[in-house]
Amino acid sequence: MTIQYTFSMIKPDAIKRNKIGQVNTYLENAGLKIVAQKMKFLTKYEAACFYDEHRARPFFNSLVEYITSGAVVLQVLKGEDAITLNRTVMGATNPAEAEAGTIRKDLGESIEANSIHGSDSENSAKREIAFFFNKSEIIE
């Protein structure tokens, strides 16, 4: 097993429903350590740059609108195989298809408003962490 860092974003739907603590409990109970965390409102420009890989997809504009509709909580998580572990704890993108006991099944409302985003690979994790955090903000 390898110690990894991964990126997580608690989305506006979960923030509006006061679920930050609940999401963090899922993450920590799974063995992930939150080593950086901050809340912010993303600008449309930041959101478009962050989700640039989806720019040509039909849902891109609605994704940018949604993710800028309220505050988000940005996080760096650390743990053994953190990327895979975080993906497992999050559950399937569509809450209706996610397994019971996952964040998206228990807290998600729809495919878009599914409460959480997480990196899907090492390259994505590195890019997404660097997009929002500098090294001095990450506590070991």
Curated annotation (Swiss-Prot):
Looking up SMART domains in the UniProt record yields:
NDK (SM00562)
Name of this protein: Nucleoside diphosphate kinase
Catalytic residue list: H117 (pros-phosphohistidine intermediate)
This protein's cofactor list reads: Mg(2+)
Q: Which GO terms describe its biological process?
A: CTP biosynthetic process; GTP biosynthetic process; UTP biosynthetic process
Question: Which reaction equations make up its catalytic activity?
Answer: a 2'-deoxyribonucleoside 5'-diphosphate + ATP = a 2'-deoxyribonucleoside 5'-triphosphate + ADP; a ribonucleoside 5'-diphosphate + ATP = a ribonucleoside 5'-triphosphate + ADP
Family recorded in the similarity comment? Belongs to the NDK family.
The role this protein plays is: Major role in the synthesis of nucleoside triphosphates other than ATP. The ATP gamma phosphate is transferred to the NDP beta phosphate via a ping-pong mechanism, using a phosphorylated active-site intermediate.
Listed binding positions for ATP are K11, F59, R87, T93, R104, N114
GO-annotated cellular components:
cytoplasm
Top-level taxon: Bacteria
Naturally occurring in which organism (per UniProt): Rickettsia peacockii (strain Rustic)
Query: Which UniProt keyword terms apply here?
Result: ATP-binding, Cytoplasm, Kinase, Magnesium, Metal-binding, Nucleotide metabolism, Nucleotide-binding, Phosphoprotein, Transferase
HAMAP family, per this entry?
Answer: NDP_kinase
Q: Which residues form the signal peptide?
A: none
Q: What is the protein's quaternary organization?
A: Homotetramer.
What subcellular locations does the record give?
Cytoplasm
In short, the EC number is 2.7.4.6
Q: Which NCBIfam families match?
A: PRK00668.1 (NF001908)
Q: InterPro entries from the xrefs?
A: NDK-like_dom (IPR034907), NDK-like_dom_sf (IPR036850), Nucleoside_diP_kinase (IPR001564), Nucleoside_diP_kinase_AS (IPR023005)
MF (Gene Ontology): ATP binding; metal ion binding; nucleoside diphosphate kinase activity
Q: Which Gene3D superfamilies match?
A: Nucleoside diphosphate kinase-like domain (3.30.70.141)
Q: Which CDD domains match?
A: NDPk_I (cd04413)
